[in-house]
Amino acid sequence: MTLLYQMVHFALFASVAGECVTTLFQDACFKGGDITVAFAPNAKHCQIICTHHPRCLLFTFMTESSSEDPTKWYTCILKDSVTETLPMVNMTGAISGYSSKQCLHHISACSKDMYVDLNMKGMNYNSSLAQSARECQQRCTDDTHCHFFTFATRHFPSIKDRNTCLLKNTQTGTPTSITKLHEVVSGFSLKSCGLSNLACIRDIFPRTAFVDITIDTVMAPDPFVCRSICTHHPSCLFFTFLSEEWPTASERNLCLLKTSSSGLPSARFRKNRAFSGFSLQHCQHSVPVFCHSSFYRNTDFLGEELDIVDADSHEACQKTCTNSIRCQFFTYSPSQESCNGGKGKCYLKLSANGSPTKILHGTGSISGYTLRLCKMDNVCTTKIKTRIVGGTQSVHGEWPWQITLHVTSPTQRHLCGGAIIGNQWILTAAHCFNEVKSPNVLRVYSGILNQSEIKEDTSFFGVQEIIIHDQYEKAESGYDIALLKLETAMNYTDSQWPICLPSKGDRNVMYTECWVTGWGYRKLRDKIQNTLQKAKVPLMTNEECQAGYREHRITSKMVCAGYREGGKDACKGDSGGPLSCKHNEVWHLVGITSWGEGCGQRERPGVYSNVVEYVDWILEKTQGP
């Protein structure tokens, strides 16, 4: 079948510029604007590739029916346009769409789908036997160099190749081509899903240079940006950053992206003014997107200029850059004149790879990056402006991840607390459901401060599924943790926002600011409170906690918080609610309110499910196939 071009333009032009368009247009092709061509197993994956490409705004994907030439099948054509859109023409078998950079919802590079009868081609560097495609996928996920895989089933025509798991990679991280092949299954590494078991090394080592193969060099203002660039480069495993004080002027601010056959540096040398570290691609549930809110003073980022506008401040300049979909970074030059009202010049810029082409210092300017991609990160890491006010009563928006879980039978009432951890997921305590027989009687209310706000017409989320840890027996024995899957996904707002799960790599973090929140009793014989209560509580070692609960065993699955002298504590009605701790300006869900003796009794701290110990279980249930 030949390509069918019918020059019939769709009415889809400037009206969509800068807007979020999620529709995929069947039998349609964007005309012009080609940047590069990749290969993808379907249009949705092509959209993911476009979204994470520094310049792609639109794409066209070619299905099998688009051409009689199989080499053109599965091509993903990435496109750009100064007007942010392109004319669209009819083309049989083509599917077109827009990058999700314009969208406010969470975007992930995670792709768990399996593609039956597709052979995704690349360099086959490892071959082994596996029992299933899932086993092969996990093997790829746990291999440092693997980008994608192909598994030959037990019905594969060649007997000697049956159950073979081929691990593959390419320079770009995407297949070099995709062909039809019966009795094979292909898929991608799940590293970007946060499901790798490889070691996660978060340290950045000062006065250190790594050797081995340098696969690319880019400009970066600091080692943290360099690490982000390495993390999102398909082949970068570790990096060395040369600071602005590096003795060779032409090499200053260079970010050297590196790899090795072993996956680790073969040697490291002491070098002043150099910093080295590792990609975070292997880190579980914490792979960040390129999001940097820092301002770099007395610094000029060079690149292709998109526009020059007036701005009151560097913050306003960054906002303008963020609101311009093609802007990747900016430089703000403060005004030296008083006649223009103090406005400075805001230079909006971009480059082929999303990084400055050169970085100059001592210019008096202030530079930084767009925040547009920050929403694509695990949104919980956004440094939301929560303010902890005095007293014991919370205010609106103070704890945007806190929910109140109501049961409607026999009469509607507050049952437990819980925490938003995803747009369709609530983490709470298993013991809340000891008497609940069906999710149909549950309602989740978010953004609520006072229970009295809840009326018959107050919007809520229905619960599709209750997932209780299969090892749960009773709260005092541990495993007191449960997930609620909502019937519909929520949109994030200032009063409805997820909290981060703690990373398994952060087990030794010393949290110094922890708060427990809920509508529970303030004393043993009391009633549910109308206004959301809060209490700042210190974490306690399990040994200290065990001393107060000799009749129970305090395990690593539990974490305790409270004061030795008693007083502030969680109580009845707080169950399932969050123990929220702040670290590096990011809030983490350290505990889920589980059990305790009394309310705020001396040497009887509150006992919480230790969330970090359940991260794998949470990810399995919320991100599993």
From Swiss-Prot:
SMART domains: APPLE, Tryp_SPc. SUPFAM superfamilies: Trypsin-like serine proteases (SSF50494). Residues 20-103, 110-193, 200-283, 291-374 form the Apple domain. Keywords: Blood coagulation, Disease variant, Disulfide bond, Glycoprotein, Hemostasis, Heparin-binding, Hydrolase, Protease, Repeat, Secreted, Serine protease, Signal, Zymogen. Its EC number is 3.4.21.27. Disulfide bonds join C20-C103, C46-C76, C50-C56, C110-C193, C136-C165, C140-C146, C200-C283, C226-C255, C230-C236, C291-C374, C317-C346, C321-C327, C380-C500, C416-C432, C514-C581, C545-C560, C571-C599. This is Coagulation factor XI. GO terms for molecular function: heparin binding; serine-type endopeptidase activity. Its main location: secreted. Glycans are attached at N90, N126, N450, N491. PROSITE patterns: APPLE, PAN, TRYPSIN_DOM, TRYPSIN_HIS, TRYPSIN_SER. Residues 1-18 form the signal peptide. Activated by factor XIIa (or XII), which cleaves each polypeptide after Arg-387 into the light chain, which contains the active site, and the heavy chain, which associates with high molecular weight (HMW) kininogen. Activated by F12 (activated); the presence of negatively charged surfaces accelerates activation. Activated by F2 (thrombin); the presence of negatively charged surfaces, such as polyphosphate and dextran sulfate, strongly accelerates activation. It is found in: Secreted. Homodimer; disulfide-linked. After activation the heavy and light chains are also linked by a disulfide bond. Interacts (activated) with F9 (inactive and activated) in calcium-dependent manner. Forms a heterodimer with SERPINA5.
